[in-house]
Amino acid sequence: MPLGDPSREGAEKLPATIRALGWTSFLTDLSSEAIYPLLPNFVKGLGGSAIDVGLLDGIANAVAAVVRLFAGGLSDRIGRRPLVIAGYGLSAVVRPAMGLVATPPAAVVVRAIDRFGKGIRSAPRDALVTDLVEPEVRGRAFGHIRALDHAGAALGPLVAMLFLLAFPGTERTLFLFTIVPGLVTLAVIGRFVRDPPRQAAAGGPTLATLTGAQWSLLGCVAVWALGAASELFLLRRAEDLGVAQPLVPLVWFGISGVKSVVAAWAGPLVDRLAPRRALVAGWLGFAAAYAGLAWSPSLPGAIACMLGVAAAYGVAEPAERALVAALSPAGRHGAAFGWYTLVQGLMALPAGLLAGWLWERGPD
């Protein structure tokens, strides 16, 4: 179960496919996040700058964004499972190649292909969750998956830290080993994930299919995403305030652990309060935590604000997905999640570049 999950019984009442998707997310993030916290220093060692760090995430997410849109619409026609398998499979095979790169551009390419895989699977997976559960428990279902996702993200950096403490300077070997949980992920999907019976939709994800409420939500998501710069900058801030590089994964463990705990509790809360209210609360908390981080000169204060950012994410993520599902017409859930993830991904590039530019030129 996710870290701090308050309702094991509630999770056990979820369909087996959703429980399997939760553990799939856990395994994927276990491998992905063992790498992620090490990337800023790794790119720096390859001769990269803070702008390269912004490009690493910005380009990767932007490339995946368009794929998410078409993958979501395609899943409305051919089913969710084939695209979920393809997306997880691509990432599992490509991610270990980070251990072979020699230049910052090569690192960007590997990261982009990894995120390309995420783009293929993200919208179909969330649409599959929507297909499988009733509206009154969508918050719980998305909270369960996000909690396990972040539990994997918490343990991945911890495994990386212990590995590097035992074998200093072997980051590339660690990257290569991430193929193991990736292959286990594919085995779980192949055994447990199934599409429910449903009628295939006609046509693709066109702008004409969006309702006024969906347009409003996408506009709000775009504004929020522009201010939500890559969390790699949180790790770089921790390093600047004195956290030793081998201990940086421990910071990421704390951030992801808080996300896991809060998402597990927030899922049922979203169902009770309504997704819109929970989403506003999460976004306001996010803004307040980032404002505190900007003004905190000490490491303890900065860490507290980073954990505040994590808590806000834990509330906002299941609320966003539950609201997207609630606003999407029947048979168009894949396209709806495709548009949602498209907006998130497209805003990642300007958000990353803006954060990198401010980092390079702003006050110390």
Give the label of every model feature segment:
Residues A11-N61, Q214-V251:
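Helix-loop boundary and gating motifs at the non-cytosolic
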Residues N61-L69, A154, S256-A264, G345-L349:
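Residue-level signature of mid-helix packing/kink "hotspots" within the transmembrane helices
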Residues V67-G79, L164, V262-P275, W359:
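Helix-to-loop junctions at the C-terminal end of transmembrane segments
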Residues P82-A97, I179, R277-G292:
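Structural signature of the two symmetry-related core transmembrane helices
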Residues G99-V110, A294-C305:
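Helix-loop junctions at membrane interfaces in 12-TM secondary transporters
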Residues V110-A151, L323:
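Cytoplasmic helix-loop-helix junction between adjacent transmembrane helices
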Residues L164-V180, W357-D364:
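A membrane-interface helix-boundary motif in multi-pass transporters
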Residues V180-Q199:
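C-terminal membrane-cytosol helix-exit motif in multi-pass small-molecule transporters
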